[in-house]
Amino acid sequence: MAAKKNKKQKREDYRAAMKQDDVLTMPRKKFYRQRAHANPFSDHQLVYPPHPDQMDWSTLYPAYVAQEESQPEATPSSTTEDLSAPVKVKKLTQDVEVADIGCGFGGLLIALAPVMPQTLVLGLEIRVSVTQFVEDRIKVLRRQNEESKAYQNVSVLRANTMKFLPNFFRQGQLSKIFICFPDPHFKARKHKQRIVSTTLNSEYAYAVRPGGVVYTITDVPDLHGWMVQHFEAHPMFERVGVEEQEGDPCVEIMRNATEEGKKVERNKGEKFVALFRRLEDPVF
């Protein structure tokens, strides 16, 4: 009699089965077990390009790969591979314009896909299993919608935004950044791990084009105040007024589409929203 599989083996078998090309059922979260948070200062052995121009987006957005021409050579996107070995970078017909930082299980990505059908949206998530869940979720949605080509415009990437955001995006490339229900890091000694800070806001200002918007939402009043304080203190951002904020369709999606947002709703909690517009670059 065969021994019963333990939970870890069941998870591994399930995820291996999800890699088959004919799977049409949505992945189940219980097979993608992961800690709630990850330390952004740890060495996660992440893969990242040395420069945005050397990022190969073709595997993430295969429907948007440009026709083959003379493609520039690039170094491999890895900290462990031989950086002297050149590789070909397949260009896309358009750039990624929207980033969901800490995308979790991908609720916002999936909701934005039909609302922004002509825009490439990327989820950035540091946790391995959660990233795999979102990847499998998008693959299934693409298979289910082969005729309409829906969900080809969204993808997910395992990345540490606190360290490597400028490695993926050129100056002014993004029109929107979403920061939804980030880890509040309640202890004062952990505040340096918060995804909004003076230093990180400068990186957001670099990646977001003038007129672009950073969207924030949390159910923690203290963290909301922290994010507002740090963005309002930054010379390249201004807070968007309440009337304009509530008229933005992305705000309603952000409130209700994320898994954390739904959890807060079930618990009858309060959601705090703030938007910040990227100002024009100063003229010297």
UniProtKB/Swiss-Prot annotation:
The active site is at D183. It catalyses: guanosine(46) in tRNA + S-adenosyl-L-methionine = N(7)-methylguanosine(46) in tRNA + S-adenosyl-L-homocysteine. It comes from the Eukaryota. Signal peptide: none annotated. S-adenosyl-L-methionine binds at G102, E125, I126, N160, T161, C180, T258, E259, E260. InterPro entries: SAM-dependent_MTases_sf, Trm8_euk, tRNA_(Gua-N-7)_MeTrfase_Trmb. Pfam families: Methyltransf_4 (PF02390). One of its GO terms (cellular component) is nucleus. CDD domains: AdoMet_MTases (cd02440). Its EC number is 2.1.1.33. It is found in: Nucleus. One of its GO terms (molecular function) is tRNA (guanine(46)-N7)-methyltransferase activity. PROSITE patterns: SAM_MT_TRMB. Catalyzes the formation of N(7)-methylguanine at position 46 (m7G46) in tRNA. Belongs to the class I-like SAM-binding methyltransferase superfamily. TrmB family. Forms a complex with TRM82. This is tRNA (guanine-N(7)-)-methyltransferase. The gene is TRM8.
